[in-house]
């Protein structure tokens, strides 16, 4: 007997909770300056209960070819990757209207 998702009530292999959550996230992408003048792209605004932030960070780091980390519910990427991060998030299923790039 397959496991049932507690949120949507569907079997785990048919669960659509993460897909629905991706469309509802209000994401902010911005650049900050860190120690020694280095730039850091911050992708913020994820609901960690619904989206696997660590897996998303790994995919962003692989595609952007940079280092980075996950702090609380935000992803930090080394360098200025605002445009590339926005394109990647849109391809992953996040709504273009809900992504705010500064």
From Swiss-Prot:
Give the InterPro entries listed for this entry. Answer: DENR/SUI1_TIF, SUI1, SUI1_arc, SUI1_arc_bac, SUI1_dom_sf
Alphabetic keyword roster: Protein biosynthesis, Translation regulation
Q: Which GO terms describe its biological process?
A: formation of translation preinitiation complex; regulation of translation; translation reinitiation
**Is the keyword Endoplasmic reticulum assigned to this protein?**
no
Domain of life, source organism: Archaea
Record-linked Pfam families: SUI1
Per its record, what are the GO molecular function terms?
mRNA binding; translation initiation factor activity
- What family does this chain come from, according to its entry? Belongs to the SUI1 family.
Query: Under what name is this protein listed?
Result: Protein translation factor SUI1 homolog
Q: Which organism is it from?
A: Methanococcus vannielii
Organism ancestry: Archaea, Methanobacteriati, Methanobacteriota, Methanomada group, Methanococci
């Amino acid at each position: 007997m397959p496991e049932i998702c507690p949120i949507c009530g569907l079997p785990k292999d048919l669960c659509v909770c993460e897909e629905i959550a991706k469309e509802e996230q209000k994401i902010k992408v911005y650049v900050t300056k860190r120690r020694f003048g280095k730039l850091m792209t911050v992708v913020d605004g994820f609901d960690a209960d619904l989206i696997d932030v660590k897996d998303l960070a790994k995919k962003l780091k692989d595609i952007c070819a940079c280092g980075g980390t996950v702090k609380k519910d935000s992803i930090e990427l080394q360098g200025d990757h605002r445009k590339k991060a926005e394109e990647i998030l849109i391809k992953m299923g996040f709504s273009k209207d809900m992504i705010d790039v500064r």
